[in-house]
Curated annotation (Swiss-Prot):
Keyword field contains Cytoplasm: yes
UniProt family annotation: Belongs to the EF-Ts family.
Subcellular location: Cytoplasm
GO cellular component term of the entry, any: cytoplasm
Protein name: Elongation factor Ts
Gene: tsf
Annotated function: Associates with the EF-Tu.GDP complex and induces the exchange of GDP to GTP. It remains bound to the aminoacyl-tRNA.EF-Tu.GTP complex up to the GTP hydrolysis stage on the ribosome.
Length: 270
């Protein structure tokens, strides 16, 4: 068996963030092999975190952006969310997503970040910090993009992030990104709204009109009006502009010479 010194234990503790006794036992089991000992600790602590975290929610966190990538990284508390290690890891993961052009969580988890995968980086971060940490969402767009990030409080990292892919003038795209952050549209055009959802909204609007005792001959028109109101809530191009309330977002974008091709909006906890 290798001779394990206090310096060896300290070195492994600094490397993994595990307790002194866990580090000593891992080094003994690995016969002094640091790489093997670190892996043993990661497995052991990872199992403990999984057991403890099964019923815990990672409903805090932040949104980070890099180039054409937008990433949400979740944790349990805002205290961890604003910590330097968590913020730095989120930015590194966003950088990795942009470089690899990774547009979904599983693909991003497999991307190499130094000598580890992104998935392993997230696991190690959870072990070091001691909270449930999850890679929540990721989006990647190829074309020209603008990003807009919003903080809920000055001392917290961004909790809302928007990524807009566009053609034409950048200024219009920036305005659209702010609109998306504030008004939470779910679709770009009404054609993107699933047919079953439109049918359900139409059914609700019609039933509401009848319950209110509206004249039968007026129900069809009232229903269409209410359905148009629904579209104004959920469709970006049909929303009233937050900067020019008498105009739709589409009208403002047309005047700016901007076409929004697609967008992503991530909000921590939503």
């Amino acid at each position: 068996m290798a001779n394990i010194s206090a310096a060896d234990v300290k070195k492994l503790r600094e490397l993994t963030g595990a307790g002194m006794m866990d580090c000593k036992k891992a080094l003994e089991e690995a016969d002094g092999d640091f790489e093997k000992a670190a892996e043993l600790i990661r497995i052991k602590l990872g199992k403990k975190m999984a057991e403890r975290g099964a019923e815990r929610e990672a409903s805090n966190g932040l949104v980070a952006t890099s180039g054409g990538a937008l990433v949400e990284l979740n944790c349990e508390t805002d205290f961890v969310a604003k910590g330097d290690d968590f913020v730095a890891a989120a930015q590194q993961i966003a950088d990795a997503a942009d470089e690899a052009k990774a547009g979904d969580v599983e693909a991003l988890k497999a991307v190499r970040l130094g000598d580890k995968t992104v998935g392993e980086v997230v696991e190690n971060l959870a072990i070091t910090i001691g909270e449930k940490i999850e890679l929540g969402r990721v989006a990647y767009f190829d074309g020209p993009v603008v990003a807009y990030m919003h903080k809920r409080a000055a001392d917290l990292p961004p909790a809302v992030g928007v990524l807009v892919e566009y053609d034409g003038a950048e200024a219009g795209a920036r305005g659209a990104a702010m609109q998306i952050a504030a008004m939470r549209p779910q679709y770009l055009t009404r054609e993107e709204v699933p047919g079953d959802r439109v049918a359900k909204e139409r059914e609700i609007a019609e039933a509401t009109s009848r319950e209110e005792g509206k004249p039968e001959q007026a129900i069809a028109k009232i229903t269409e009006g209410r359905l148009n109101g629904f579209f104004k809530d959920v469709v970006l191009l049909e929303q009233p502009s937050v900067t020019e309330s008498k105009k739709s977002v589409k009208a403002v974008l047309d005047e700016a010479g901007t076409t929004v091709k697609r967008f992503a909006r991530f909000e921590v906890g939503a």
